[in-house]
């Protein structure tokens, strides 16, 4: 069991993958400790710090100072903020910057940012010189509890989200809870959707705890650290069992089949929809669709929607600004989902709170009819 170990100033959650195991450190002040922690694990490295313009303005100087104190030379590579940086063009830009800096295979790529920066940086680290070291320093709640853990990396294409990438586990994850204080309320809410997801997958006790304590999670302190640690613990356990998503790791995609389709439909325009908002709507739809298919009671869907609404997250197609294309177009995006096998649809559905399961061969006609109904309500 990947039980978190508590220290005076941080929590450590191990990810057990044999000789590729690594630690997730969670706590305050980890930006300042980053140089020390990296130096313990990666001797004599130089690093490329990949970050976006917004994060760089707030955290880059402190991180570079931390590396300098540890005797680690760092080269910043700054990209534009937002989902559109998960592109072939930005991939080429970052790759070229690392090669121009003459970083070697034994050096490290450090991702300082949210899920976009982490996904992009991990892909770069996996392909430059056929594989460099990789350190995740997630600065959003979403990245701290989800995308920084487990080794999924990649970019988007015109055909859909995350369709080009590699599995590339980091050597270390440093989740500084203090940096979350700089997030906008919208960004924090979006990350919270992934926290709630872990309770909805297979931990009804955790979901009930979130229903009772979400305000404390938002305000910070011990409840926030607990929510992050428990989320990481849940994901680490799944990744240890199924690193390459050949089995139950697919459960972590609860809400993502619908959510990714909505992100694609909005052109990855973060002014309209960010990933966590898509996941929130996607989870609500997954519970509604499960009820429609007589797999779960409507009470579970209503409870999920009530909690997500309480924290300020969207739960319906009507809440996507700018409207959506017809159901047939949404189905085209769903058909590009990575869980599609030989043309058949796979969804993560549910029998109730904390009772999610992998549903194979879901009838496309049923999904299409469901989407038409939900769009009509919108």
Swiss-Prot record:
NAD(+) binds at residues 115-119, 139-140, 152, 161. GO terms for cellular component: cytoplasm. It catalyses: 7-phospho-2-dehydro-3-deoxy-D-arabino-heptonate = 3-dehydroquinate + phosphate. The keyword Transmembrane does not apply. Zn(2+) binds at residues 194, 256, 275. Binds 1 divalent metal cation per subunit. Can use either Co(2+) or Zn(2+). Its cofactor is Co(2+); Zn(2+); NAD(+). GO terms for biological process: amino acid biosynthetic process; aromatic amino acid family biosynthetic process; chorismate biosynthetic process. Keywords: Amino-acid biosynthesis, Aromatic amino acid biosynthesis, Cobalt, Cytoplasm, Lyase, Metal-binding, NAD, Nucleotide-binding, Zinc. CDD domains: DHQS. It holds the Pfam family DHQS_C. Its main location: cytoplasm. Transmembrane segments: none annotated. Its EC number is 4.2.3.4. NCBIfam families: aroB. Belongs to the sugar phosphate cyclases superfamily. Dehydroquinate synthase family. This is 3-dehydroquinate synthase. It comes from Brucella abortus (strain 2308). The lineage of its organism: Bacteria, Pseudomonadati, Pseudomonadota, Alphaproteobacteria, Hyphomicrobiales.
């Amino acid at each position: 069991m990947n039980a978190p170990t508590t220290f005076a100033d941080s929590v450590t959650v191990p990810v057990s993958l044999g000789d590729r195991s690594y630690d997730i450190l969670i706590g305050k002040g980890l930006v300042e400790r980053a140089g020390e922690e990296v130096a313990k694990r990666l001797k004599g490295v130089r690093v490329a710090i990949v970050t976006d313009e917004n994060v760089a303005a707030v955290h880059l100087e402190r991180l570079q100072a931390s590396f300098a104190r540890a005797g680690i030379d760092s080269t910043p590579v700054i990209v534009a903020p937002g989902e559109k940086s998960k592109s072939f063009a930005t991939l080429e830009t970052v790759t070229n910057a690392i090669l121009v800096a003459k970083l070697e295979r034994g050096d490290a790529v450090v991702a300082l940012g949210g899920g976009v920066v982490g996904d992009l940086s991990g892909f770069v680290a996996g392909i430059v010189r056929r594989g460099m070291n990789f350190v995740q320093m997630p600065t959003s709640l979403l990245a701290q509890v989800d995308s920084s853990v487990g080794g999924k990396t990649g970019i988007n294409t015109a055909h859909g989200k995350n369709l080009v990438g590699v599995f590339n586990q980091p050597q270390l994850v440093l989740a500084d809870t203090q940096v979350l204080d700089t997030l906008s309320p919208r960004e924090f809410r979006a990350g919270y959707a992934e926290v709630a997801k872990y309770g909805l997958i297979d931990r009804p006790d955790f979901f009930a705890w979130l229903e009772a304590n979400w305000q404390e999670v938002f305000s910070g302190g011990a409840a926030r650290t607990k929510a992050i640690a428990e989320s990481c613990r849940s994901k680490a356990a799944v990744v240890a069992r199924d690193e390459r998503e050949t089995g139950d790791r697919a459960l972590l995609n609860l809400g993502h089949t619908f959510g990714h389709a909505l992100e694609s439909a909005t052109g990855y325009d973060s002014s309209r929809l960010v990933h966590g908002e898509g996941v929130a709507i996607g989870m609500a739809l997954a519970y509604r669709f499960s009820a429609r298919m007589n797999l779960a009671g409507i009470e579970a869907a209503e409870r999920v929607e009530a909690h997500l609404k309480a924290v300020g997250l969207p739960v319906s197609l009507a809440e996507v600004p700018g409207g959506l294309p017809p159901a047939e177009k949404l189905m085209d995006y769903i058909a590009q989902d990575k869980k599609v096998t030989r043309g058949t649809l796979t969804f993560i559905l549910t029998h109730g709170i904390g009772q999610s399961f992998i549903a194979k061969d879901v009838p496309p006609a049923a999904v299409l009819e469901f989407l038409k109904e939900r769009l009509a309500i919108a």
